Amino acid sequence: MKYQWKDNKKFAFTIVDDTDGASVETIQPVYDCLYKNGIITTKTVWMKPPRDYFPGDSMEHAAYRDYVLQLQRQGFEIAFHDIGSGV
């Protein structure tokens, strides 16, 4: 069975962002650049705050959640990383 890529493309390339260490301050410049250049990726998120040594915001943090939802509206795929780091 041969897979037919969209628009008869020869291959697909994907980028998935690991959410460890993510905050609006650390990811916004990256996602602004990606969006400006037409590169749409997958952003992973934690639902709960980390409970170990990994820093980063979760969907319980209002500003982060709002930004992630903005990314989704821009076409970025939002994926469940885990309930939270160390949970």
Regions found by a protein language model. Give the residues of each.
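Catalytic alpha-helical scaffold of carbohydrate-active enzymes acting on polysaccharides/glycoconjugates
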Residues: 1-87
